[in-house]
Amino acid sequence: MVGWSGNPLFDLFKLPEEHNELRATIRALAEKEIAPHAADVDQRARFPEEALAALNASGFNAIHVPEEYGGQGADSVAACIVIEEVARVDASASLIPAVNKLGTMGLILRGSEELKKQVLPSLAAEGAMASYALSEREAGSDAASMRTRAKADGDDWILNGFKCWITNGGKSTWYTVMAVTDPDKGANGISAFIVHKDDEGFSIGPKEKKLGIKGSPTTELYFDKCRIPGDRIIGEPGTGFKTALATLDHTRPTIGAQAVGIAQGALDAAIVYTKDRKQFGESISTFQSIQFMLADMAMKVEAARLIVYAAAARAERGEPDLGFISAASKCFASDIAMEVTTDAVQLFGGAGYTSDFPVERFMRDAKITQIYEGTNQIQRVVMSRALLR
């Protein structure tokens, strides 16, 4: 037994070296290829093409795709690290790897081998993107009340209806779509399908005008007698809602990772600014009130990072009952991101309220992490049900 003076081989809560190397690599790429364009992407509400090109070239656009389909087969913690480091400089760009995972996780978990071979290699090798279509205007938190329908027609499926709040809508090649196949069975009458952007009867609505993540288009999807091949169903008919929930169990930590990255970016900017800013003849970082704010911000970010990585690790191990920890990681990290970015703006004073500095963008971008993939109120419902069942 090693003495209490310290054991350098004790690796509990310590990431493997390959994860640290991954962080260094993606951070360097993000700072060089993505950060210089982040302000312009936000101000012009344009898609971060530079980020997409850099992520595609490095293989970080869909690092989660298994090796047997041409991907890197990175684990869930590695995927979170990539998303976190990109979000640290540009939250919109971080939605490229994040939503590629969201849009394909149901397929990876429940899809047929043939369908996986049809879809996944295009993300890994061709730079295709994927999106996830669950919500509708009148079926948000109550997703099971969706009205989009899918009906068998010979060897095909015909989809009718629409979806809303689709991240990267119009940029993705593939869409995982939930639709009702048996209205009499409620949630057990929902099925999951893969729709291609060129499928007959499928179209994209206009981009939403948003508070934040302006570089990532958010659109509606329209299905007007949209015909897709019969083999593009994920799993068996009636299992789609379960697939949707299983997907979110695996991907909510990625939104937590995005939130951690946003918060870290704001904290980093605040540290630099407070050290440089002088009032009363000295750096404001020498004032105890400022020091305490920075300390609290850093403490919260570190705690959020740990719960996100813990949730991702449990998902990677395939542990059962992921609902609580997955919801907790997303909920806690996103609440922290909103707190930390707000404090960062405060530390900048009036300058922080302008677009001359990135913290106002971080603050606007942070808000959505409390909303998408289930509002934080719904996350608390998920957690409380897990506690009380």
Curated annotation (Swiss-Prot):
Keyword terms of this UniProt record: FAD, Flavoprotein, Oxidoreductase
Entry EC number(s): 1.3.99.-
SUPFAM superfamilies the UniProt entry points to: Acyl-CoA dehydrogenase C-terminal domain-like, Acyl-CoA dehydrogenase NM domain-like
Superkingdom of the source species: Bacteria
A GO molecular function held by the record: acyl-CoA dehydrogenase activity
Pfam families: Acyl-CoA_dh_1, Acyl-CoA_dh_M, Acyl-CoA_dh_N
Cofactor: FAD
Chemical reaction(s) catalysed: a 2,3-saturated acyl-CoA + A = a 2,3-dehydroacyl-CoA + AH2
Cited Gene3D superfamilies: Acyl-CoA dehydrogenase/oxidase, N-terminal domain (1.10.540.10), Butyryl-CoA Dehydrogenase, subunit A, domain 2 (2.40.110.10), Butyryl-CoA Dehydrogenase, subunit A, domain 3 (1.20.140.10)
Keyword Flavoprotein: yes
PROSITE patterns xref list: ACYL_COA_DH_1, ACYL_COA_DH_2
Family to which this protein belongs: Belongs to the acyl-CoA dehydrogenase family.
Protein name stated in the entry: Probable acyl-CoA dehydrogenase fadE25
Taxonomic source organism: Mycobacterium leprae (strain TN)
